[in-house]
Amino acid sequence: MDEKVYGYMDWPRIEAIVYGEETAPRDVMGPRITQDGVLIQGFFPDAEEVSVISGKKTYACEKEDEAGYFAVLLPVRKVPEYRFLIKMGETETECYDPYAFPCQITEEEEKAFCAGVYYEAYKKLGAHPVEIKGVKGTLFAVWAPNAVSVNIAGDFNGWIGRATIMHRMPMSGIFELFVPGVEAGTHYKYEIKVKGGEVLLKADPYGNSADHDPEGASVVADVSAFQWNDGDWMKERHRFDDRKQPVSIYETSLEEWKSAEELVEFLAEEDFTHVELHPVMEYLDDITGGYSTYAYYAPTSRFGSVADFQKLVDALHQAGVGVILDWTPAQFPRYASGLEKFDGTPLYERQNPAEAIHPFWGTLLYNYGSPMVKDFLISNACFWAEVYHADGLRMDDVDAMLYLDYGRNPGEWTPNIYGTNENLDALEFLKHLNSVIKERNPGLLLVAQENGLWPELTDSVENDHLGFDYKWSGGWTKDLLEYLSKDPIERKNYHDQLTMSMLYAYCEHYILTLGSRDVGTLKDFADKLPGSEEQKNAQIREAYAYMMLHPGCKMMAPDKDMPKELEVFVKDLNNMYLAHPALYQLDDEYDGFEWVQLMKYEENVIAFMRKTEKPEETVLAVCNFAAIPYENYNVGVPFAGKYKEIFNSDDKKYGGNGVVNTRVKAAKKAECDEREYSITLKLPALGVAVFTCTPEETEKKPAAEHSQIKKSITKTRTVRKAAGKTKAAVKTAVKPVTKKVTKEAPQIVNKTEEKIPVKKDLTEKK
């Protein structure tokens, strides 16, 4: 044994390395300049022989400990470039020394992390393929402040974690290490030794890819390699900060689509402005529908690779469709390899075990008082916006975040310092999150699903509120579906459920939803409604049309395999919405809506106007929720002029009976609804008729109506330049990333030859 080498051995530290308790291996292993040369040490548990190759020379290492600790003293004064040559049996492997590379996380980044303001934590924590000093490898970093030690186990080292010991940063408790030669596609986990000696095998919280099998191993992925083609879209995304833009969202699950191409073509053809996708982040149990997120920084591998999901978003943007992702920052699942007691202590979850468990799902609730947990979640939101170009996040289960007593009985929760039930840490976190997102990503939509009636949820953080852009209008959906579930004969007794929404329509910025959670499939929707199959279909069309006309953004989820008639209906509905500024420009202002007929409960009819500052842009909507049509129905109008029907849910091309108004209506000077002028129209059973209102003095436009609509659609969607791409062009932009999970779609239209009775006397009762 070389006495000089032996004399440099730090035996207590070597013992800590051998027994898996060393937290600063870079201080011991790697190169170190001494008065006798450059000392190089390494730990290779299963190696028979180890040498150091430097230039054209090879230096044999001595085994200083039988556990596999090797060292050599090079007769040089400066640290040279070198590699290890490791012999195991007949196999020889060359590798660079991971401890020859300095820490890649700066002191400033570490301080920001400890303060809860490291919004780009996703760039350093996790596993990132990088090149340092001409050497390619992967930078690993994980936060585990209470761990005794942390190792990396994976494909690259035969899952022997004790051979790859991570270095602890003392201020933050981040363990980091650059491992040369590790490439994208490598599977890995962290071996975390906790107090008491137990070793936990954990997936990477910041990992960019993961398996969805029960083991849930993390996978090294390069999320920066993709070449985006949506520059025009990203430059214009800030426009959605202006709430005067139309927002029509199609909610869908990725598993419903055979390919990305199919989804992109459908959305572009149907003229939706946005799509809300789920499930996106990796999850393990299919039964959860993707709402028990396992890997927050990884798109689920069920439907393709990291690059495949980036291609999907890129193609959607090129087709003029914004992308909203479902996000679950309220709770996380309890998996042995997940976030629960990540380093042997409650790190991500609330400290009190009794209050850490979600009362309904049995999952764990986040500790929003921890700066590092805030880093994890805020950085995650920034990650999806900045790395995957997401245009919005829909936050699930916000109630569980806001209320300490959510789902709990007295005695099962602890009040805050003021003796109330608000989660003060969660409130601060949400304000912090929304402020950061708005500053870094103007135009990104933050949507809350919250049913606890938290006041002014969508008011600004500057006004000391939470700063969401929108919240789901659960009250509107509940009232409408309850009303529609009644037999039309009984609906007059529930008329206020139809009209009540306008009493609170301006309390928040709402998204009206008839999504999968609300109505399920089309068959499920039909099962909620009374009447014959034809009447059910008519009511589905009426519900969608009423939603599109009511103040608020829109979200729907009709089956992708919907009947052709309904597909045409949805496209025309979106076209009408996009073409008429009155249907969206003043959604949040009282001046944008005016009742015409509010109390026609005997007839089951409501009528209202949607308006802008220009009278000629006024739209009149008349909705009949009775099972019988009205042949000569009088409606008061705002002024003398022409009233042209631009949409009717009973049109035969939609599967209706054709009770429509083909001729332009001239307002007559006959008082109705306390208005000087009125029109008489045909009103279909269980249907909606929509009219444009042109004042008498307004000059007739020279262009055709069809041309006007198309121009208006183009104007409201200025960055949707690729919406008219050919199918061939779309095919070149994407490749299949989804699997097909088909469900038999119900036949939504079933015409009959039976004549529909026309009710002429409005005073007569059915």
Regions found by a protein language model. Give the residues of each.
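Substrate-binding/active-site clefts of carbohydrate-active enzymes
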Residues: S209-D211, A217, A225-I249, S253-K258, ...
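Intrinsically disordered, polybasic Lys/Arg-rich low-complexity tracts
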Residues: E699-K766
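Carbohydrate-binding surface patches
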Residues: V28-D46, K136-L139, N146, Q597-G636, ...
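C-terminal beta-strand-rich structural cap/linker in extracellular carbohydrate-active enzymes
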Residues: K78-R83, A184-Y188, R663-K700
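Conserved alpha/beta catalytic core and glycan-binding cleft of carbohydrate-active enzymes
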Residues: H389-D391, Y406-P558, L578-V635, F639-D650, ...
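Glycine-rich phosphate/pyrophosphate-binding loop
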Residues: A112-A127, E131, V199-K202, N208-S253, ...
